[in-house]
């Protein structure tokens, strides 16, 4: 019997059945297609043996003028800058209490009740105490004067922590621990942590119990939603924004351990935004742009307002006839989902379509043109610039932008969107794998609260592939940058906060 050479079509096709897809591939995992043939994807290794706390959903890499490489790392609990092999905690400070904190211990318990008027803390916040004295027994000064994680809040003035020694072992109070720590206790509070899961912005179940009147819409704060950071470099410095929360500035010249500070703390700060949905630096004329910023004189996010600073200034946001600060209220949709900088253009997705933002100079500074109605983003991080085009994922399909928007034919469309957890859609993110001519999107399947699947598109060969993640390949953020010799990603072990 003569031998027959079978040639299989490249790519995965799930639009039919396994039997109807004769001559093609129906399933795969951790496989890509190159020159029409399947191959195992390359391996990976740890970038550093140091670890960060929390789920990282934002990475940003850049190189300063002195050729030092930095990576900003935003998690739902902390904010770091990675230099070399070390994660430096630069989480901004929210509040400092001076000579106003007391402690109360209970015999036989490791729980300490901390009293601090209007502390503003939430569970898992970090607070560092100083100048406390012993409570009289096992809870000595060294136990108190260190950093703690808030276990739970009791009232607006009290919360609980679990006593520990300097090695992290639990300390149990005894009957002699009757003191209160003295009258000179100081406390430094980091910004409130965010959530590790997505919550709809308003409606039943959003916000805290009894925070508004019965039947009214209940907005949620940045500490009550999935923590997403956006980042960019402003020269050698790093700027960042919590989605729906604060905007911060890290001064590289002050050292890698220097905390990031609110924009409002910058010298000569003039009407700087204090809240936003996303931040970036324009590649033309070096304006800092805040999407979903609070308006001048307001203290709430305006979800369609785009504001920008004067050229090459982080502190001057007051529009005048002698500078280039300004702002525009978008008319399409109800909120900005995300923005992406491409060559000579910034794309802004609202929940109703796509707007192109371009630098035009005086007097308008930027132009805004609606280029598409309908297609949006499934999440703020689901648009990818690659191959001189922009690929993005919406709630029901994949799209391509190259001056206009077109829907991408997809041979795994039903496989992806019939089994995706839209309740956690903001965890979805996209990335570029330039060496393989691929765009990859990670997403949670229908029964998963965390990312457990991915889908890739090879734009050179026009083929799709699919796969799953596990403890060795769980990814929550991914970047490719000129300052790196390799893709850099973040992940976590199931059930872990590191």
Predicted regions and their residues:
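Secondary-structure transition/turn motif
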Residues: 75, 84, 115-120, 161-170, ...
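Beta-propeller fold detector
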Residues: 89-95, 258-267, 319-321, 366-371, ...
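N-terminal beta-propeller domains
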Residues: 1-96, 191-218, 237, 249, ...
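Elongated alpha-helical scaffolds
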Residues: 226, 230-247
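Small/polar beta-strand repeat architecture
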Residues: 90-227, 255-271
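Short, surface-exposed terminal/edge motifs of secreted or surface/virion proteins that either
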Residues: 70-92, 157-164, 245-262, 395, ...
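Beta-sheet-dominated scaffold domains
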Residues: 2-8, 331-498
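Active-site-adjacent structural elements in enzyme catalytic domains
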Residues: 233-234, 243, 254-256, 261-287
């Amino acid at each position: 019997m003569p031998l027959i050479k079978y040639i299989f079509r490249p790519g995965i096709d799930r639009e039919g059945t396994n039997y109807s897809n004769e001559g093609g591939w129906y399933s795969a995992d951790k496989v890509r297609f190159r020159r029409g043939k399947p191959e195992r994807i390359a391996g990976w290794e740890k970038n550093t043996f140091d670890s960060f706390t929390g789920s990282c959903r934002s990475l940003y890499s850049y190189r300063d003028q002195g050729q030092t490489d930095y990576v900003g790392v935003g998690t739902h609990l902390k904010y770091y800058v990675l230099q070399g092999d070390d994660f430096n905690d630069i989480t901004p400070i929210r509040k400092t209490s001076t000579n106003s904190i007391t402690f109360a211990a209970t015999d036989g318990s490791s729980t300490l009740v901390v009293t601090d008027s209007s502390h503003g803390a939430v569970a898992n916040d970090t607070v560092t105490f100083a100048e406390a004295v012993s409570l009289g027994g096992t809870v000595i000064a060294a136990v108190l004067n260190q950093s703690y994680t808030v276990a739970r809040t009791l009232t607006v003035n009290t919360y609980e922590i679990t006593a520990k020694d300097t090695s992290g072992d639990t300390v149990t109070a005894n009957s002699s621990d009757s003191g209160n720590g003295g009258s000179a206790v100081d406390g430094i509070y980091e910004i409130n942590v965010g959530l590790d899961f997505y919550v709809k912005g308003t409606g039943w179940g959003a916000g805290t119990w009894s925070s508004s009147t019965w039947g009214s819409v209940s907005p949620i704060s940045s500490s009550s939603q999935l923590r997403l950071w956006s980042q960019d470099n402003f020269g050698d410095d790093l700027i960042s924004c919590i989605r729906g929360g604060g905007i911060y500035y890290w001064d590289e010249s002050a050292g890698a351990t220097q905390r990031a500070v609110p924009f409002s703390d910058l010298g000569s700060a003039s009407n700087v935004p204090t809240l936003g949905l996303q931040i970036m630096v324009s590649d033309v004329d070096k304006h800092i742009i805040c999407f979903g910023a609070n308006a001048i004189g307001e203290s709430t996010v305006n979800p369609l307002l785009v504001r920008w600073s004067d050229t090459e200034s982080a502190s001057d946001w007051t529009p005048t006839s002698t500078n280039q600060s300004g702002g525009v209220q978008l008319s399409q949709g109800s909120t900005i989902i995300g923005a992406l900088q491409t060559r000579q253009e910034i794309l802004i997705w609202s929940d109703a379509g796509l707007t192109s933002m371009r630098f035009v100079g005086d007097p308008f500074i930027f132009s805004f043109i609606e280029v598409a109605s309908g297609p949006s983003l499934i999440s703020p991080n689901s648009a990818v610039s690659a191959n001189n085009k922009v690929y993005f994922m919406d709630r029901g399909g994949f799209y391509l932008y190259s001056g206009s928007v077109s829907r991408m034919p997809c041979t795994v469309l039903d496989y992806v969107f019939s089994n995706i957890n839209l309740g956690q859609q903001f965890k979805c993110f996209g990335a570029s794998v330039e060496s393989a001519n691929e765009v990859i999107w990670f997403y949670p399947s229908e029964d998963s609260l965390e990312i457990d699947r991915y889908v890739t598109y090879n734009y050179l060969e026009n083929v799709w592939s699919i796969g799953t993640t596990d403890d060795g390949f769980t990814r929550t953020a991914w970047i490719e940058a000129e300052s790196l010799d390799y893709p850099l990603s973040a992940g976590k072990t199931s059930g872990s906060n590191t």
